[in-house]
């Protein structure tokens, strides 16, 4: 339900002065290209109609700067999204270096007892680091830790830092 949730809320968040995308704990999937295609739309203008009001150009484009939160629990498509967001220059990546697990599996072989086996079948290459995300992850632009003592007090240091930085970016 990740893409459906993103798409539902994305349309309500477009007109804010800044956008924070949180992919912490993203264990994978296949939605990063869909998310990135939406986030990559840079607002460059507006249309104004006589009766329906103002619209962004291009449609459904982000109004301001973006920051993505990631952490060491973002793997597979979480790694791919984080690295792509950074590589595409969509905004700052903050939190912790990602997990580094981008080898894809295909669970298609069953044993006689019904056990399903998986084997690595897909790898991922980026134009800036080649195969370098696998077994390493993606470095963040700014490392921010959520310490256990803060977590116990319901303090999200990474999110607080993202809010602080996006507010500074909006003022520029």
What are these regions (language model features)?
Residues 16, 46, 126-172:
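In a subset of proteins, long, contiguous C-terminal domains/tails are tracked
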Residues 90-151:
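C-terminal structured "cap/appendage" subdomains that terminate the fold
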């Amino acid at each position: 339900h990740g893409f459906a949730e993103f798409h539902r809320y994305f349309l309500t968040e477009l007109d804010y002065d800044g956008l924070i995308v949180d992919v912490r704990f993203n264990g994978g999937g296949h939605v990063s290209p869909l998310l990135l295609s939406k986030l990559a739309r840079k607002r460059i203008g507006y249309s104004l109609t006589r009766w329906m009001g103002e619209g962004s150009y291009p449609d459904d484009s982000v109004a301001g700067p973006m920051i993505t939160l990631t952490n060491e629990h973002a793997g597979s498509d979480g790694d791919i999204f984080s690295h792509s967001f950074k590589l595409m220059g969509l905004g700052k990546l903050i939190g912790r270096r990602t997990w580094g697990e981008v080898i894809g599996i295909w669970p298609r072989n069953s044993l006689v007892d019904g056990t399903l086996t998986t084997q690595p079948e897909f790898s991922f290459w980026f134009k800036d680091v080649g195969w370098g995300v696998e077994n390493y992850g993606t470095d963040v632009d700014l490392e921010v830790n959520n310490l256990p003592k803060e977590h116990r007090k319901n303090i999200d240091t990474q999110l607080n830092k993202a809010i602080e930085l996006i507010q500074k970016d909006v003022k520029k």
